[in-house]
Design a protein with these regions (language model features):
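N-terminal alpha-helical targeting/anchoring segments
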Residues: 1-136, 155, 159
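TRNA-recognition modules of translation machinery and tRNA-sensing kinases, especially anticodon-binding
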Residues: 23, 27, 131-426
């Protein structure tokens, strides 16, 4: 959630940022509504504080009068205190209503794009931050997409997964399952080598956690909800891992906080259809290793580069062609201040598939979660939060199968062999 003080003090920047996200002049009127409600909140709070202060003073005076044996005067003041209490209760209800209205508007505002975010309305306007400089794979005649390879080598059973759960829930088996486990372990080892603490978080979260990272209310329709227990299946490990520090004050000396975790991820992907959803291209359940970084505001953009470099290292080590896109304002996620997407090239499909998003949220998440740090002077300030996929497995597996196929089978990258125990799928 945006900080209200930023809306008040940097209104021109907020307007410019929201326009970059596609806000019309009519939609921008919400800013004046927010400021007016905040003015009302301050006014009601001031009047309420004044009444409460007066009530406390009168209560002390009543106590002193009773001690002095002046019961008549004390009882007269008690009736005045009762009147003040009724007025204070009324103001308290008014304050709660105003805050509720204010919060209802605030949660509809997305994060303000960083000044470097490209202009644009949709994915077509994203800018290539780093193009693939090498040659794209040239496949032998008769090469097929990964879903056919998965069937040929008995790696993934899409039909059985659909029979058990529904479409979009692939069942990995044999070397397919071992490849999944190998990738998870490899990615976690690389994160640990970079100083990330490994976390194994819950797969179900409550509404407060989903709200804290921004999934609620923006992405609620894309989440699986367990109504009997009022819990949500996580769409990404970002949600439970970032919430580890919800409501906490982190000593500045303990920063940065670097966390990494593997989880299955669950996404409804409502409205998805067509060739882009075939095989592993778009599924409802997939495995992912996530890295989360909690950082001092002055260092977060240097940190963002380190996270992008980490994901680049993983892609290079897997010997996969990839490119990095800088998302435009119109395609960026609700909570993000800036996002870099990694896309892998799947040679049999001749498509670029997203396998990672690395984002800086600045104070958007930490403001919702009341996550702060305490500086050397004892002052508390909001931290910056960042996260990235390092990596999402489904499309990585798709690219590994497609790009490395030959007449003899599928050869795996060297870095994975110690984890799989085999170098060929045949």
């Amino acid at each position: 959630m945006l900080e209200i003080q930023i809306i008040r003090d940097q209104k021109a920047r907020v307007i410019s940022g929201l326009k970059k996200r596609g806000f019309s002049d009519e939609r921008l009127q919400i800013l004046d509504q927010i400021i007016n409600l905040d003015d009302q909140r301050k006014d009601v709070q001031t009047r309420l504080d004044s009444l409460l202060s007066e009530r406390n003073s009168l209560s002390d005076e009543i106590g002193n009068l009773f001690k002095q044996g002046k019961a008549k005067e004390a009882n007269e003041l008690k009736s005045k205190v009762q009147s003040i209490k009724e007025n204070a209760d009324s103001l308290d209800q008014q304050l709660k209503s105003t805050i509720s209205d204010l919060d209802g508007l605030m949660v509809t505002l997305p994060n303000i794009p960083h000044e470097t975010v490209p202009e644009g309305k949709s994915a077509e306007d994203n800018k290539v931050h780093q193009a693939w400089s090498g040659k794209l794979p040239i496949l032998p005649e008769g090469s097929v997409p990964h879903w056919e390879l998965a069937e040929k080598y008995n790696l993934i059973d899409f039909k059985l997964g659909a029979s058990i759960s529904g479409s979009g829930f692939p069942l990995f088996r044999g070397k397919g399952a071992r490849l999944q486990r190998a990738l998870v372990n490899y990615f976690l080892d690389q994160a640990r080598n970079e100083g990330f603490e490994e976390i194994q978080p819950p797969l179900l979260v409550n509404a407060d956690s989903a709200y804290g990272t921004g999934q609620i209310p923006d992405k609620e329709a894309q989440m699986y909800y367990v109504g009997l227990d009022d819990l949500y299946l996580i769409p990404t490990a970002e949600v439970p891992i970032t919430n580890i520090y919800r409501g906490q004050i982190i000593p500045e000396a303990n920063m940065p906080v670097k966390l990494a975790g593997y989880t299955p991820c669950f996404r409804r992907e409502a409205g998805s259809y067509g060739s882009d959803v075939k095989g592993l291209n778009r599924v409802h359940q997939f495995d992912k290793v996530e890295i989360v970084w909690i950082e001092h505001p002055s260092k977060s953009y240097d940190t963002l580069k380190l996270m992008v470099d980490h994901v680049s290292m993983l892609m290079d080590s897997l010997e996969l062609p990839y490119r990095i896109l800088h998302l435009c304002g119109g395609d960026m996620g609700f909570t993000s201040a800036t996002t870099y997407d990694f896309e892998v090239y799947a040679a049999a499909q001749q498509k670029w598939l997203e396998v990672s998003s690395v984002s800086n949220f600045e104070t958007f998440q930490s403001n919702r979660m009341k996550m702060r740090y305490r500086d050397a002077n004892g002052k508390t300030q909001l931290v910056h939060t960042l996260n990235g996929s390092a990596l999402a497995l489904a499309r990585i597996v798709a690219a590994l199968l497609e790009n490395n196929q030959s007449a003899n089978g599928i050869k795996l990258p060297k870095v994975l062999v110690p984890y799989t125990g085999f170098e060929m799928i045949d």
